[in-house]
């Protein structure tokens, strides 16, 4: 097909895009499938390309997990395809993905690294490296499948390098044979710092003004769950199996485990509620078990006051009695911060509260701040890299390493908190908010 754009005829204006759909098995296990499609100028799908088959690491294996979905990679691939075939196909003199050469890829990677984002910034180094890795793997998979039909070869795409592992052992690895030049920017990343004293106010405030998500805040702040994972938590009575389990010894709860090992269908309308980044059974950090139990008991009382689909028994319910979606959870958290926490801090006589409240007018505080707060507490409790990775539910140690690198600053600026949260919940919550 001729990919040259005809801007006067939207039906002939084609663009590569990602299309995703969520399915579920008869036993309720939910999974996502993503495709690379061609859409016309009206946004309608005109063709499924099958190119997604060459994006994943399972392309050449005999077994692939049901939940394996290359969606994040497909956005990088579509960006490259649109640049090569849609935007510059005429200049390059190509009409098919097989015609892409290494010099064309080099141009694209440099263009991606230098491109200014809508917010005025530039792609981070890690994002550029991810783009190069994904696109290189995609082209290598095509070359492996179709051989000489593809102009670029695997030998052109990769170079062998010997690296030294942390164990001291030498290992040969195949590294993408590209180097992109980008604009380096000092960035503090998203605003996410939250002083311990602010958390002590946020918890009782959530119970009063946002009881439907207060326990979700606890799951993030005391068990390190991501917002999308929170929405996948089930009640103890779920027919899929208890979403939360307790280990009690001598009348005392010693361990609490949150089951986010699988995504299940939790709504009768099949609407997606959120995704689990790492499927696992996540424990509540021991120091926070007491406050977590208090929050859980309050949430169970709340659930008795609302209607929900008993067949699915979701832990979090929206105003329609359906499992709460990530987007709804995010909006409710934002409203809690903007409508209640921020005004309370700005009006405080405590200078630290007033300064932080002003910062909330200048920066958006998202749900990721809760997981960041949790991680800071782990660092202050002297957890090592393995401990951070375990309690955070990370796939790689990269994030843990970054926190440990900044440990000195964290110790100086923040403080450990645990028992004071219980006190804040019972005393501040009772006296200040009449809970």
Predicted segments with their positions:
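Catalytic-site neighborhood detector that most strongly recognizes the C-terminal catalytic loop/helix
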Residues: 392-417
């Amino acid at each position: 097909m001729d990919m040259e754009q005809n801007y006067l005829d939207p039906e002939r204006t084609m663009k590569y895009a990602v299309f995703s759909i969520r399915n579920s098995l008869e036993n309720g296990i939910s999974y996502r499938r993503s495709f690379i499609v061609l859409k016309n100028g009206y946004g309608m799908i005109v063709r499924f390309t099958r190119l997604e088959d060459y994006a994943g690491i399972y392309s050449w294996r005999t077994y692939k997990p049901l939940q394996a979905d290359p969606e994040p990679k497909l956005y990088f691939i579509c960006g490259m395809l649109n640049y090569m075939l849609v935007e510059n196909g005429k200049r390059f003199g190509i009409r098919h993905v097989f015609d892409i050469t290494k010099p064309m890829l080099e141009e694209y990677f440099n263009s991606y690294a230098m491109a200014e984002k809508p917010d005025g910034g530039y792609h981070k180094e890690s994002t550029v490296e991810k783009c190069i890795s994904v696109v290189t793997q995609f082209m290598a998979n095509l070359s492996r499948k179709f051989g000489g039909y593809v102009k670029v070869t695997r030998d052109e795409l990769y170079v062998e390098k010997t690296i030294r592992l942390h164990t001291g052992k030498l290992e040969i690895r195949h590294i993408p044979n590209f180097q992109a030049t980008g604009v380096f920017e000092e960035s503090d990343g998203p605003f996410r710092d939250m002083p311990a004293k602010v958390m002590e106010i946020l918890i009782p405030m959530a119970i009063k003004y946002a009881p439907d998500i207060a326990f979700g805040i606890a799951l993030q702040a005391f068990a390190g769950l991501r917002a999308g994972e929170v929405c996948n938590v089930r009640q103890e009575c779920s027919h899929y199996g208890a979403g939360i389990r307790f280990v009690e010894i001598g009348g005392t709860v010693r361990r609490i485990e949150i089951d986010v090992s699988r995504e299940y269908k939790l709504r009768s309308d099949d609407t997606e509620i959120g995704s689990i980044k790492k499927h696992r059974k996540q424990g509540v950090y021991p120091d926070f078990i007491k406050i977590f139990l208090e929050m859980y008991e309050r949430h169970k009382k709340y659930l008795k006051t609302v209607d929900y689909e008993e067949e699915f028994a979701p832990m979090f319910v929206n105003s329609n009695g359906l499992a709460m979606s990530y987007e709804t959870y995010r909006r409710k958290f934002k409203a809690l911060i903007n409508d209640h926490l921020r005004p309370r801090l700005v009006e405080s006589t405590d200078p630290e509260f007033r300064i932080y409240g002003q910062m909330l007018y200048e920066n958006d505080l998202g749900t990721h701040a809760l997981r960041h707060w949790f991680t800071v507490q782990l660092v202050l409790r002297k957890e090592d890299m393995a401990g951070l990775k375990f309690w955070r539910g990370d796939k790689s140690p990269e994030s843990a390493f970054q926190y440990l690198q900044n440990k000195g600053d964290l110790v100086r600026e923040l403080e450990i908190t645990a028992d004071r949260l219980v006190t804040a919940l019972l005393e501040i919550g009772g006296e200040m908010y009449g809970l």
